[in-house]
Structure formats: C-alpha cells, structure tokens
Amino acid sequence: MPLLVEGRRVRLPQSAGDLVRAHPPLEERARLLRGQSVQQVGPQGLLYVQQRELAVTSPKDGSVCILGSDDATTCHIVVLRHTGNGATCLTHCDGTDTKAEVSLIMSSIKSFSDHTQRGRLEVHLVGGFSDDRQLSQKLTHQLLSEFDRQEDDIHLVTLCVTELNDREENENHFPIIYGIAVNVKTAEIYRASFPDRGPEEELRAARVLTGGPMISIYDAKTEQLRIGPYSWMPFPHVDFWLQQDDKQILENLSTSPLAEPPHFVEHIRSTLMFLKKYPSPTNTLFPGNKALLYKKNEDGLWKEISSGGET
C-alpha cells in the first residue's frame, strides 16, 4: 500500500509545496519545525549518522537514545518509525540510489517489527532547499515516489523539504534546517547540530567521498557501531585537489557551493588528506580485514572494542 497523509493516498507527482497546502497539518508541522532554535547535541547517548549511512534502533536500546545527522544542503534526512514498538531509523540520503536506499530503510525497520503489533509506519522528511540545479526537488520527488511504491502503508507526518526548507538572502538560496535529531524513546524530532561526529569521522567521510553506497552502521542487538571493513581505489588527483583554493573546492566538490556550512571546505580538505594518507585502506585501517567495533561506555561515549570477526 502507498504513502498516506491523514489517512488519504498522496497524489503524486506534485511539489512539496502543493502537497502541504493540500494538507494543513503537514504545513503546520513544517512551520513549527522551521521555527525551532537549533539545539546543540552532545555525544552522550548519541549515534551520529553521516551521509549515505543508516542507523536503526528501538527504545529498548540501553546505549543509544538519540539518532542525528546534519550538514544536509541538497541532501534529505529521513526518519522512519514504527509507532507500535518504537523502532526508529534515521538516514542521510543524497540521491545516489534512492530506490535501493528506501528499500534498505524499510527492511531495517521490518527487522524490528513484529507486524502483529499495533502501530503504524510514520515517515519524516527534512532537508534540501530551492537550489539552482533542482537537485533537492529531484530527491524529494524520488523519496516520495519510492515510499509510495512500498507494500506497507506509510504515513507521511513531517515534510520540511526543498521549497518548504528554503530561505533567500541577497538573491541566494539556503536551507533553513541543516540537521535534525530524533529521540528514540520519546519520538521527538528537533533541529540540531552536533559538535562531536565520531567515532572515525574522517574514515567514514572518506568512504562517502570515494563513492561508497548506503550502509547500515549499527547493530542494535549487540549495541555496537560497526565500521568497515571498507575498500576504495586511490582518490584521483588528490594532490591536485589539495592544492586548490577554497573557491575551487566549493565549486567542484559541492552540489550547492553557496549554501554549504562554514566548515565544509575544512572537512573536505581533511578528508582528502586522509585519502592521501590511506590510498588503500584494507590492511592499514582494518587489520586482518576486520571491522572496527565501538560500544558506548558508562559515560555514554563511544569506545573501541576488539575488532569484529566475520567481514
């Protein structure tokens, strides 16, 4: 069955703006979310999700209570939740392969869901803006269409994307919301930023920059964050890119150069330096080709434990 709003089938294709105008509760929810102040989320109990990563857990999790992601410009952050058992998935989609990504989101939630349970699947889409290349608009359409193609009823509860998440300044467009968090125990979704994006922020970013697909990074049964093992080819012309000025990096390595957060170029440079240092990560970063495993300690912070077994 399809994507529903207020129990009614969503008529697609239509723009995000037209969709919320047809459903006042959606419009009001987007307005309230945009109007929030940004909360800075500390590392305790947090699982930070990078671009092209997915994490799913439930209120039974004793380690992770907040899932979050930010730095979404043309990207969208997707939260899918089962209201019966509270299983919650957060992912940061960039349009690389939306069909496969939505399929992964659905299967990750279903791995938790006993469908004899009461409750329903609710989806929240946040991110993007009115960018010149219409990448946000395309991603919004892809996500709505793919959720509409699923067998299950999926209730669209939050839609704050593209033109609904846009502000204009000096004739340039920017997102209003760059990041959100979801409290797994209360289901609250709120605007957020994250000073701590670990563990292994550079390693995870390097995987994305070299074209890695969407992956699930967390095992809620063992409450372990699993990183890798990854492999990539040496990044082409890495020395050339490291010699370029900020403007060149922005214009060539961003989908939306004018709308990126201030730390974007620094983040890209550090990721390129990492790729230069580790052109082939398999044995240098993943001894024995085993995953890096992390678990929350008593203070709610990630701590590395012994490497994983199977690859």
Curated annotation (Swiss-Prot):
GO terms for molecular function: protein-N-terminal asparagine amidohydrolase activity. Its main location: cytoplasm. Pfam families: N_Asn_amidohyd. Keywords: Cytoplasm, Hydrolase. The keyword Hydrolase applies. Its EC number is 3.5.1.121. One of its GO terms (cellular component) is nucleus. It is found in: Cytoplasm. InterPro entries: NTAN1. It comes from the Eukaryota. GO terms for biological process: adult locomotory behavior; memory; ubiquitin-dependent protein catabolic process. It catalyses: N-terminal L-asparaginyl-[protein] + H2O + H(+) = N-terminal L-aspartyl-[protein] + NH4(+). Monomer. N-terminal asparagine deamidase that mediates deamidation of N-terminal asparagine residues to aspartate. Required for the ubiquitin-dependent turnover of intracellular proteins that initiate with Met-Asn. These proteins are acetylated on the retained initiator methionine and can subsequently be modified by the removal of N-acetyl methionine by acylaminoacid hydrolase (AAH). Conversion of the resulting N-terminal asparagine to aspartate by NTAN1/PNAD renders the protein susceptible to arginylation, polyubiquitination and degradation as specified by the N-end rule. PANTHER family: N-TERMINAL ASPARAGINE AMIDOHYDROLASE, PROTEIN N-TERMINAL ASPARAGINE AMIDOHYDROLASE. This is Protein N-terminal asparagine amidohydrolase. It comes from Sus scrofa (Pig).
